[in-house]
Amino acid sequence: GPGSIAGTYMEALKGSQTVKITAVLGHREESAKAFSEKYNIPYYLSTEQMYNVENPDAVLICTPTFTHGDIVKTAIDKGVHIMCEKPFVLSAETAQQLFDMAEEKNVRIMVMQVVRFWPEYLRIKQIIESGEAGEVTNVYANRLSAHPGWCSWHKDPQKSGGGLYDLHIHDIDYMYYLFGRVKNVYAVGRQTETGCWNNVSTIMNFECGIKAVIEGFMDITGEWSFSTNIRINSTKMAIEYLNKRVYNSKATKEKVENLVIYHKDREPEIAAVPQYNPYRAQTEYFADCVTENRPTDTVPCSDIVYILKILSAIEKSLETGLVQNIE
């Protein structure tokens, strides 16, 4: 797919010695040709022609969510390894079926949950798991965005899953990555006229005893720039990562991005976090796993199935107003 996220990967992979994008497949010639010319790679409008001519080792699926299933099935039939943008599909059952099909054909699949590779989020995980923070006492995160105006399918919950599956999934996934299995969830939100849950606030109750409040809004009014924030309080420190653009005194947008550690017994510090492109990191990670014949432990398929179960429970809580247990 020659869309915006595909362009993000193309920019990220410039100069990579591990991964080379050899072609783009699209369904509209105008966009496919423009992408082809921008990145100097051939384009195809025929799936069969692309596979026959290019004979790829892997495909990177950057198409609308509702198209993922059929594209994945075709790649499995061709014996081609698969990287797929999130959300993979919109149900745990469908995801499990596709993963089972891939396993039978010895095809690797990794869903691109990029937050697991994000430098600051990865540093937070390292701090928590090392015990440096002490006991975690409360957790809050948000991910806020105006609604994407560049497509119509995003407004159809049967095609996109709405903000719940497209945006909120990032922080739900990351919280599970940090704290493990979830006991139950409770959520409140606002549903659009078309049925999308684009405004969601979720309370996650983890089996380990930690509770987290997560907000995902894809309906912010006005010229709101995409922003993320996570705050973890613990017995030894408070940790906050903020990434947003704010208006300064000159009424121009100024980017604020830092990971601050507020120590209990000394002055706060801005954490030194080695910077790299997380989109490149996750793509090269998958390529290394395939070539070295090792599992994609950072994003196992079983995690994707579990996250989709959590999202389904959140959706049911939104609809019923009740706490939902996770199987």
Listing of model-derived features with the role each one plays in the protein:
Residues 41, 78-80, 105-108, 209-211:
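A short helix->loop->beta-strand "cap" motif at the edges of active sites that frequently abuts
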Residues 172-250, 273-276, 280-295:
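Contiguous beta-strand/loop segments that form the cofactor/metal-binding neighborhood of enzyme cores
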Residues 115-194, 200-203, 321:
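Predominantly a Rossmann-like dinucleotide-binding segment in NAD(P)-dependent oxidoreductases
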